[in-house]
Regions:
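Structural helix-adjacent loops and short alpha-helical linkers that scaffold large soluble proteins
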Residues: 165-174, 225-233, 263-270
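Beta/coil-rich, acidic/histidine-enriched accessory regions frequently appended to metallopeptidases
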Residues: 245-326
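Hydrophobic, well-ordered secondary-structure elements that form the walls
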Residues: 155, 218, 231, 260, ...
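Intrinsically disordered, low-complexity linkers and stems that provide flexible hinges
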Residues: 1-55, 62
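Juxtacatalytic substrate-recognition/specificity segment
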Residues: 40-147
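Acidic/His/Gly-enriched intrinsically disordered linker/tail segments
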Residues: 146-216, 222, 238, 244-247
């Protein structure tokens, strides 16, 4: 199949497509843009991003581009580099206050679209985690919506971890954000199991429950892998991204967990999923948090105390170096 665009003078089409389009360009959701603006490739974190800002009045391109670059740099603190060699990132101005809203899509190639307040400033972007979160999604191949607990859980957990590793927030603040997220998920009570809630997340608007219960399972897996002194969840995700982030195959949570557990050398993640996916209760975290010496703090930062696994607590958020160029 050939695709030809006939465009007005000065307008350019921006698509994540390759010269020879894969089947996913037609079978999976994708995004693209038509614009009179130009997009210069951004080399960052060992990869390349084609960054495009759209819309009248959205004239803070350099601030937005710098923010996206920081998000890519932060995500590399997990994967060792940008998890895909090249991706399209589209920033769209919107009438919304607070953090941005984004989506990571795979049809025809990896792409991220982020909707931002059209009046954003460098100061407001400094605390916005959306770019980091969406770029982390690119480290896992496309999964079906019913597996949202896994792909959103991993991204939610590591959004805080990698921002601490990059120095954007302190480890104490990162843990506080995790504790607050876990509490939001716990408070979002449901009569459904996590598995069923994931399948109906959009219909039931149960985002907190699904995102943060999934993040809790990633956290429990991370701590258990470190406690047993084997390979870490970080290293398992790095290996997985290297082989499969850009995969055009159909994946599901069970297959991803099996791959990660092979790298971990033990079924850590699968066991957590089996323990909690078919239950209505939020995953139990109190014992693990006590073993780490982590407790909620009064001023936006968690309180650290002496504990059996304090070294694990510190290692999770320890600074990570920038990646080398590919």
């Amino acid at each position: 199949m050939q695709v030809r665009f006939t465009l007005p003078d000065g307008m350019v089409a921006f698509m994540p497509w390759q010269t020879l389009l894969p089947e996913t360009a037609f079978a999976w959701k994708s995004t693209g843009a038509f614009s009179h603006a130009s997009a210069e490739p951004m080399r960052v974190a060992g990869g390349e991003l084609d960054v495009l800002t759209l819309g009248p009045g959205f004239d803070r391109d350099s601030a937005v581009r710098d923010w996206i670059a920081r998000g890519a740099s932060a995500s590399s603190r997990l994967f060792g580099q940008l998890p895909v060699r090249r991706a399209l990132v589209i920033a769209v101005p919107a009438d919304r206050a607070g953090p941005g809203f984004g989506m990571a899509l795979r049809g025809g190639g990896p792409a991220v679209v982020i909707f931002l307040d059209r009046h954003v400033t460098r100061e407001s972007l400094a605390n916005d985690w959306t770019a980091t979160h969406e770029l982390l999604h690119l480290g896992v191949p496309r999964l079906p919506p019913e597996d949202a607990w896994l792909f959103e859980g991993l991204a939610s957990y590591y959004t805080e971890v990698v921002r601490a590793r990059a120095g954007s927030i302190s480890p104490a603040r990162a843990y506080q954000h995790l504790l607050e997220g876990f509490e939001r998920g716990r408070s979002n009570e449901s009569s459904l199991s996590l598995r069923d809630e994931s399948s109906q997340m959009h219909e039931r608007r149960s985002f907190y429950r699904v995102y943060w219960a999934g993040a809790a399972l990633a956290f429990l897996t991370d701590v258990e892998a470190r406690r047993t002194s084997g390979p870490t969840l970080d290293s398992a995700l790095q290996a997985f991204a290297a082989c499969c982030a850009a995969s055009e195959e159909d994946w599901n949570a069970e297959r991803v967990l099996a791959h990660l557990d092979r790298s971990l050398g033990a079924p850590h993640f699968t066991e957590q999923a089996r323990r909690w996916l078919d239950r209505r209760e939020f995953p139990a975290l109190d014992g693990v948090l006590r073993s780490l010496g982590v407790a909620p703090g009064p001023r936006g930062e968690a309180i650290f105390g002496p504990a059996l696994n304090a070294a694990i607590r510190d290692a999770i958020m320890a600074p990570a170096p920038l990646p080398a160029a590919r």
